[in-house]
Amino acid sequence: MTQNFTIRQARPEDDAARATLLAPTYGADAAGLAAEAADIRHHFRDFGDLAPGIVRLVAEDANGAILGALEATVRLYANGCESVGVMFLEGIAVAPSCRETGIAAALLAQLEDIAREAGITEIASDSRIDDAVGADFHLANGFSEAERVTCFVRKIDG
């Protein structure tokens, strides 16, 4: 099958399209995600378009339409990993009409190349415990289940 898309680093003008694709993955609204991307870019403007440790990739067709998006961060630790400094797949999404075309695999391959070039040896990810589709995606793309955890949050006043 001919690959009818290219993978590249996301640019600011991709924020709305990326947010539309990724919003269901994050259980968020697209406008909020696009605003968050702009806010991160503003806070890290001295570092160029991307904040340190944040990877944002898109799959784009010949007409410039965004068909898929991936976000990852470098974390010091991720559950189940053996190394310090782990690439963490925060979210990945492909337009419904473009699924099963190799876009997700190509996005993951590019992320792996970026991680390898940075000396990172593991990519981690997560999905909600009740998300069978997410679990199936990870397993089909070379991830193995490491552990199950319960997450907690403590708010800080002031």
Region locations from a protein language model:
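Acetyl-CoA-dependent GNAT
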Residues: 5, 9-12, 24-84, 90, ...
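Hydrophobic adenine-recognition pocket in adenosine-nucleotide-binding enzymes
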Residues: 10, 92-94, 127
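Hydrophobic pocket/interface hotspot
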Residues: 18-22
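Conserved acetyl-CoA binding element of GNAT-fold acetyltransferases
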Residues: 83-96, 150
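Conserved acetyl-CoA-binding loop-helix of GNAT-fold acetyltransferases
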Residues: 94, 100-113, 140
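Conserved GNAT acetyl-CoA-binding A-motif
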Residues: 115-127
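Conserved beta-strand-loop-alpha-helix junction that forms the acyl-donor binding cleft
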Residues: 125-134, 153
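Conserved acetyl-CoA-binding loop of GNAT-fold acetyltransferases
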Residues: 139-148
